[in-house]
Every structure is written in C-alpha cells, then in structure tokens.
C-alpha cells in the first residue's frame, strides 16, 4: 500500500485554544478523521520556529534532546553523514520514497538532508508551476500539493510509495491588519484588534 505522511505547518486545532471561539469549524475533515480513526496529541521540540527539527524527530525517531541548544541536525550532522529514517527503512522493503514541499529546497538545507535520510526524490517549489499565493502574499497555497503528490505515485506505477508532504500555507507572519475580504471564518474572544485580525487570518488559512 502507498503511505502518505503530511506535516501541517504551524497547525493547531482551534478547539484546543480556550479563549478562542470560531463561528464554524475550519477543519471539519480533520475532526472527522480524528473521530473515526486513531488519533492523539504530538509533543514537538519547537515552538514559533524550527519546523525542520519536528521533521527530524518524526522521520528518524531521534530526540532533539541529544543535540546542542539551537542546533538543526539538517544543517549540521546531516551534512557529514547519512542517517537512518522511515524512508531508508521503507526503501529496504521495496518502497519508492518521496518528499513534496511547496517551499524552497535549500531552506534548512532540506535538499541535502532528505538525500542523507534515504529519500529517492524531493519536489520543492522550484520544480512546481506555482501561480497562487496566500492572502498575505508570502507563501504558495497548499492546493498544489495534491497534484504534485499524485505525480510521485504516477512516476512509480510498479512500486508502493511513501510520500512525505510538508505544507507551508499556514506559515506566519499573521497580519495584524485585515487582508481577507469577507472571511468565511471569524473569531471572537480576542480583545486586541490586531490579534483578532491575526487569528482570523490563521483560522482561514487552516481551511
């Protein structure tokens, strides 16, 4: 069987934020999956920055506790040596292994790091025909990841695939001024107008 793993950039469930109320559920598909399949909480080693270290722990099973303060293994040890990972293990049993990410390949030295962890291919934004960006203009929208993921399956019709997908559409900064006209999702429980605008932007990007 094919295996898909999706890392949702800067994701959190708004229902878990005690002070925040949203007019309707911005992530109904997530909640449906959570209700009907195995689910749980994930402890991550970073907050506010450092997505690559969450990736590293998830892909390798190694804890960031054993690395230096502020270290990014993608930019240090993986420039010197290979590292076993989910990708290398699955390759041993015949899987083709891929990464799809709609941001730059050299950010966090990902191009090198994924190669060192045993991935066969890495499709970064440089290899995509990106035409749509988030409302703040900073990041490609995530919908392109669907077609790019399907391409990884189509490229290896006689193999099972492991495709690791990294989104970017919910990445900060979150604008303090309103940038979405007539947002589908609106928030309450936030008194500061700038923070309210930021939360409104965030929950709309989650969807």
Go through the PLM ranges and name each one:
Residues 1, 5-8, 12-207:
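Solvent-exposed soluble domains appended to multi-pass membrane proteins
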């Amino acid at each position: 069987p094919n295996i898909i793993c999706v890392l949702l950039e800067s994701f959190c469930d708004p229902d878990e934020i005690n002070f925040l109320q949203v007019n309707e559920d911005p992530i109904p598909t997530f909640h449906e999956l959570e209700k009907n399949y195995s689910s749980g909480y994930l402890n991550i080693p970073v907050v506010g920055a450092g997505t690559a270290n969450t990736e590293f722990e998830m892909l390798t099973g190694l804890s960031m506790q054993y690395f230096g303060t502020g270290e990014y293994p993608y930019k240090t040890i993986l420039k010197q040596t290979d590292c076993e990972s989910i990708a290398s293990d699955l390759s041993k049993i015949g899987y083709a292994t891929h990464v799809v990410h709609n941001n730059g390949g050299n950010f966090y030295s990902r191009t090198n790091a994924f190669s060192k962890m045993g991935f066969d291919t890495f499709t970064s934004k440089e290899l995509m025909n990106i035409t749509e960006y988030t409302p703040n203009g900073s990041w490609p929208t995530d919908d392109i990841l669907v077609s790019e993921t399907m391409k990884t399956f189509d490229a290896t019709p006689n193999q099972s695939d492991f495709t690791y997908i990294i989104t970017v559409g919910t990445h900060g900064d979150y604008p303090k001024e309103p940038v979405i006209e007539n947002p589908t999702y609106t928030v309450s429980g936030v008194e500061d107008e700038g923070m309210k605008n930021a939360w409104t932007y965030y929950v709309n990007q989650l969807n």
